Each structure stands twice: as C-alpha cells, then as structure tokens.
Regions:
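Sec-dependent bacterial lipoprotein signal peptides
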Residues: 1-27
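Lipid interaction determinants
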Residues: 27-146
Length: 146
C-alpha cells in the first residue's frame, strides 16, 4: 500500500516537472522579433559600464527590413540581422572609418567584437541583452526613450 502511495506521489511530481519544463521552454522561445524594434543605447560591455566622450553608442533595429543602423562609439555602422526564436546574428556589416577619442575607439572595438560574437538575444523590460552561443552576456542596452 505504501509503495502505491509513493508511486502516485512520484507520478505527480514527474508530471509537475514536465509541465514546468514545457512552460519554461515555451516562454524562452516566445520572444517576437518586434521586441527588438527601435533604438537601443549601449550601457555595458562584458559587465563594464560604458560612457562615451563624443557620441552615444547605440544600435537601432528595423525589424521590417531586417536591418540595423547605429554608432559603435565613433563610427556609424549599417548592416543586417537574422532573428529566430531568440537567436540573433548580425551580417553584411559596413561602417565609416573615422578616428575619435581613445576611450570611444576602445568602446567601438569592443562593440565590433560583441556584434561578431552575438548569437542570442533577450529583452527584459527596457533592457536588451546580447549574448554569445553559450548564453554569456556580452553587452546590455537600454531602450531609448526618444
């Protein structure tokens, strides 16, 4: 009799675990590309706060055309992106080639690396997280209020 009770409890717990896992998987895949739309200001790179001297670093997503535009610190950048279920890849990138303050050039070099390594994206409220293939945070951006 006790064995039957234990087995029933185990079945309930197993069902509960399956439901939780399913809900977790569905919610992680539910991000819509439209959440990326608009201008995002770069706030941190590899958990280090970003402060530019001359121009604010930003990325602007045009989700209808699959294009991005932005400033990585000094230079303007244009390119395309693909998005599928939280996976994000930048491509066909082109940028101007100006020099600027050393601090801004360092931010720009870091952002070029971030864009190259980005494989996943997550939006949490007004914060966008760019992540590598393992889910490690590369950069965080805040939605512009303009």
């Amino acid at each position: 009799m006790k064995v039957m009770k234990v087995m029933k409890v185990m079945k309930v717990w197993n069902l509960f675990a399956v439901v939780l896992t399913t809900v977790g998987l569905l919610s992680s895949c539910s991000m819509d590309v439209k959440e990326l739309e608009g201008k995002w200001l770069v706030k941190s790179i590899e958990n280090e706060s970003v402060t530019t001297v001359e121009r604010e670093a930003f990325i602007e997503f045009n989700t209808v055309e699959g294009k991005i535009h932005g400033c990585l610190g000094v230079n303007l950048v244009n390119g395309s992106f693909t998005f599928d279920k939280g996976n994000l890849k930048f491509g066909n990138m082109g940028m101007t080639m100006m020099m600027g303050p050393a601090e801004d050039m360092e931010i720009e070099r870091s952002m070029i690396k971030v864009l190259d390594e980005t494989a996943k994206v997550k939006v949490n409220g007004t914060t966008l997280f760019l992540m590598d293939a393992s889910g490690n945070q590369l950069a965080s951006l805040e939605r512009a209020t303009e």
